[in-house]
Amino acid sequence: MKKKTMAFMAGTMILGAILSGCGVKEDNTQSTLSSSSEVSQTEASPSSEAAQSSALSTGYPITIETKGSDFITVEQTYNEAPDRAVTANASSIELFYNLGLSDRIVGTIAIDNAPGDDWKELYDSLNILGDKMTISKEVIAAAEPDVIIGRSATFAEGTFGSIPELNELGINVYAQKASDMSTDVSMQSIIDDVTTLGKIFNVQDKANAYAKTLTERLNTVSEKVAASAGDKTLNVLVMATYKEGTFVVFGANAKLQNGMLSALNCVNVMNKGGSSLTLENLVEANPDVIIYVTADRNAESDAKAVESMKNEEILASVPAVANNKIIEVPYDAFMDYGVRNFDTLEELSDFLYN
């Protein structure tokens, strides 16, 4: 199902903002492209001085398709590069940092875990608008952003606001393609997010160069896995919050993470996520590998989780425990939707196949 957001009708002040900046445009002649498609762009005229370089320039207006928590496709039109952005998760902050767009961030939603070392200073300098449990669309609107970036599930009616609700406030939305739970996604989806943001913000050269680096990293992992794994598939259990013999799992319905496992020739032994699983469930799952996802809020229990599993006699025959194939990864480096996932992919590749 697809719907097109309409021009705002809230008054001359909002209308003026739409006409001068980013907005949803009611123009049937405007070409519509998905976030993974080519957006119309122009190169500098050969007769101009700018044509001496290979710089790509976005031709505005452009229309990008995106999806909120209902996974209905919504079109977002940008009449110019956004000047003011709100980031809604750690991976969107990191994307802005790597694309040289840090100065466009006018506010962010507080993140759950410590920021990455390379962008910690940036995060510490940002205006924290609130946390994900209490933030409201009115607070977001008060920061006067042109656009907000985050995962699809964030954009729901209620506190944060659906895409149409935010559009009515004069705010465009870009939901990360890598966070789309309605379809199969992969590490390529993160690369697509990089190039699409490059088009939206008119930093295509930087985005394309960064995307090339990520593609090369992905190809290196793929070649290593193909050479090392052959036809062998590893059964993996993705676990978190291990306490006194119970734990949480993330299942194959976590689409990006499932795509990461597929790239490593691995299969998630759990179809869906769940909580309050027991040691008996772990024995029954019989994984070759356990990926243990750590989080700051579980720091105390996480510190002893792996050792506790190894000391459980009932788990002695589980291959992951018997062969010491348990690896810890930070939540935001595995369960988020950004470039840190590439670090984790490489770490997992080394752990599994070295």
Question: What is the predicted role of each segment?
Answer:
Residues 2-4, 8, 20-94, 200-238, ...:
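Bacterial Sec-exported substrate-binding components of ABC uptake systems
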Residues 11-18:
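Bacterial N-terminal signal peptides
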Residues 77, 136-147, 278-286:
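Short helices/loops that flank or line small-molecule/ion binding pockets
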Residues 84-143, 147, 151-153, 266-269:
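A short, structured surface patch at a secondary-structure boundary
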Residues 91-94, 111-114, 147, 153-157, ...:
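Solvent-exposed loop/turn segments at secondary-structure junctions
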Residues 111-116, 248-275:
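Alpha-helical, coiled-coil/dimerization segments enriched in small aliphatic residues
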Residues 115-116, 152-161, 171-196, 230-256:
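Extracytoplasmic ligand-binding site segments that recognize negatively charged/polar headgroups
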Residues 184-201, 208, 291-354:
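Structured C-terminal subdomain patch of bacterial secreted/periplasmic proteins
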